Amino acid sequence: MDSNTVSSFQDILTRMSKMQLRSSSEDLNGIITQFESLRFYRDSLGETVMRMGDFYSLQNKNKKWREQLGQKFEEIRWLIEEIRHKLKITENSFEQITFIQALQLLLEVEQEIRTFSFQLI
């Protein structure tokens, strides 16, 4: 993963963890947890593309891999909707900027995962 994406993930996760939103903190913690999970998945998928041995292993487990990939895209869509909702209800400009950046990062990561998955298919 490129260093800008790594620092973007870390920056957004740090800022989200410091937020105190009117909605329950459990909602935000869920978003943070999903965001971290997505980051790890994206990292592992990128590493898999780099190692041909894993490529052949993934081909052998193709059905399971495709199901997992589908679940990750569902998680991304859920995160995008949650962040859009949070963006609509927040009035704090710091939070708005954080959510806008999180949304941009999610869209970038979704595109990267799509690119990696096409390379693996």
Swiss-Prot record:
Disulfide bonds: none annotated. InterPro entries: Flu_NS2. The keyword NADP does not apply. The keyword Acyltransferase does not apply. One of its GO terms (cellular component) is virion component. One of its GO terms (biological process) is exit of virus from host cell nucleus through nuclear pore. A motif (Nuclear export signal) lies at residues 12-21, 85-94. It is found in: Virion; Host nucleus. Keywords: Host nucleus, Host-virus interaction, Transport, Virion. Belongs to the influenza viruses NEP family. Interacts with protein M1. May interact with host nucleoporin RAB/HRB and exportin XPO1/CRM1. Mediates the nuclear export of encapsidated genomic RNAs (ribonucleoproteins, RNPs). Acts as an adapter between viral RNPs complexes and the nuclear export machinery of the cell. Possesses no intrinsic RNA-binding activity, but includes a C-terminal M1-binding domain. This domain is believed to allow recognition of RNPs bound to the protein M1. This is Nuclear export protein. It comes from Influenza A virus (strain A/Equine/Prague/1/1956 H7N7).
